Amino acid sequence: MAGAKEVKTKIKSVQNTQKITSAMEMVAASKMRRAQERMEATRPYAEKIRQVIGHLGHANPDYRHPFLVERDEVKRVGYIVVSTDRGLCGGLNVNLFKAAINDLKGWQEQGVGAQVVPIGAKGIGFFERTGVEIPAEVRDIGDRPKLEQMIGPIKVLLDAYVDGTIDRVNLVSNQFVNTMTQRPQVQRLIPVEPVREEEMLENWDYIYEPDAASLLDDVLRRYVESQVYQGVVENIACEMAARMIAMKSASDNAAEIIDDLQITYNKARQAAITQELTEIVSGAEAVSG
């Protein structure tokens, strides 16, 4: 059995770790609430711009933008994979990478090539190890990402799609279900899913300047950018929720370890006291004898 002093040192060490994990849990909870607010604030824009695409498409049905046309044969798929820059968030990234790899393998089994634009240091490190082609990347997005950080890498895939280098673009990110649940999802970005008439709510008659086709070119790019940005913001909310839960679990585990060590410490101290008493009694008997 370890000595009482050694056990006391271990207890102090675990208590210090528990203080750190508890502080990280509180910080993550605060950041999660702010990330949720940003996530909710960006959704109306993404929904509205999709409605605008529907109106523009119906206003000029003869114009078929490349982003709206599904190609007969898919030879190469591009992925935008949104991960985190930091760890300590449970299995969030692992589950995300599994979803991405499963989808990617499904295409590869059909003889389709792939390239990946990872967002987040964890994703960059993972896909560099897989050997997949990485034409662009984004790291250090922070807790308050800016669209400007992502426009360049997004443009790389959009230009590749227009050039015919790739025939489909997917977005892989985590969906925030609730504080306890974050679900990885693979979403098709391009070609853009057709907008159903019921999604447009109203059939307004617009006046277009310069014309509907030119406006559609710009709006479709903005739509893809908004979807990626929404995915990044939502992924940050998922990251903070997962980190909060992971740190709470670590704090709870630390408390259990402290309880076990405290019992061990009490036993060691009791054994030491018993030993001292035995020695005192033995010494007294020797003197009296």
Swiss-Prot record:
GO molecular function, one term: ATP binding
One BP annotation, GO: proton motive force-driven plasma membrane ATP synthesis
Places the protein is found: Cell inner membrane
Subunit annotation: F-type ATPases have 2 components, CF(1) - the catalytic core - and CF(0) - the membrane proton channel. CF(1) has five subunits: alpha(3), beta(3), gamma(1), delta(1), epsilon(1). CF(0) has three main subunits: a, b and c.
Cross-referenced NCBIfam families: ATPsyn_F1gamma, PRK05621.1-1
Role played: Produces ATP from ADP in the presence of a proton gradient across the membrane. The gamma chain is believed to be important in regulating ATPase activity and the flow of protons through the CF(0) complex.
Database matches in HAMAP family: ATP_synth_gamma_bact
Key words of the record: ATP synthesis, Cell inner membrane, Cell membrane, CF(1), Hydrogen ion transport, Ion transport, Membrane, Transport
Pfam families: ATP-synt
Protein name as catalogued: ATP synthase gamma chain
Membrane topology according to the record: Peripheral membrane protein
Organism: Halorhodospira halophila (strain DSM 244 / SL1)
PANTHER family per record: ATP SYNTHASE GAMMA CHAIN (PTHR11693), ATP SYNTHASE SUBUNIT GAMMA, MITOCHONDRIAL (PTHR11693:SF22)
Record family assignment: Belongs to the ATPase gamma chain family.
GO CC, one annotated term: plasma membrane
